[in-house]
Amino acid sequence: MSNLFEPIPYSLWKEDKQAFAKRLGSSFRETGFAVITGHPVKQTVIDEANDAAKAFFALSSEAKEKYHDAEGGRQRGYTPFGTENAKGQKAADLKEFWHTGRKLPADSKYRSTMKDTPVVDEVPEFDAATYAFYTEMDEFGRDLLRAVSLHLELPEDWFDDKVESGNSILRLLHYPPQENPPPKGTVRAAAHEDINVITLLLGAEEAGLEVLHRSGDWLSVNPPAGSLVINCGDMLQRLTGGVLPSTTHRVVNPEPERAKFPRYSTPFFLHFNQDFLIEQLPQCLEEGGKTQPPITAQDYLMERLREIGLVKA
């Protein structure tokens, strides 16, 4: 793996917060990505969520389709193969996925726009296993944002109350085997950027993730086993005026000898609270960051979901 993605040990955060924040921020500035080793997400929680996901995707198309909410923007439940496309792309990605969202209290002001995640009847352990994983990724993501705060010379807890009820999503991805050559111009996930604040991604079983460096080269990301890949999303890029970039990335089709194997992936998309107003931080503008009009996290999300075909324009 390129030294641009040199792993950062999470233990450094416990030993020297400023040193960890500096390394994380430097990696984000250079590539928009970072690799973290020794993360606190329990392996048993990861394994149980992955097993539940594989059991769900093994169900019949008819069974999975029961959990498809096309009218709700597909922000919860199942999205079928060939539905989502990258911004500016006509061809749909070669994937299917499931979204697990935050469980809100009954009196939450966000309940009208943040639906409950459907319970999968056919896989009894699915709800508990995936939400346990969601919870641990959410907690770790907030810890990483504390490091981002320090890097941006903000109070360590600056992000805490801005993401505590965020519309964050655990996406369980399944890229099916390619028994036959895929249609011309299609890939598992076309070049795109993430919409959210930061994304946490566990190392995939099958290779394929590539990042577009500012040099114009596509760089393969093959993190050490058990590590997490973290990347900046468009919301963080907008907040920082581009000081922390949301980098274009993709998942390419497998080599012929690996085409018969499926690929599973579990990105966690950490979002702001829906009513948070995204506007550029003054210190980032002083660095030369780009000014953009203020916009709420929810309005920005819906704008982007329309662009990628998950919400009707």
Please state what every model-predicted region is.
Residues 1-313:
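Peripheral, non-catalytic segments flanking oxidoreductase cores
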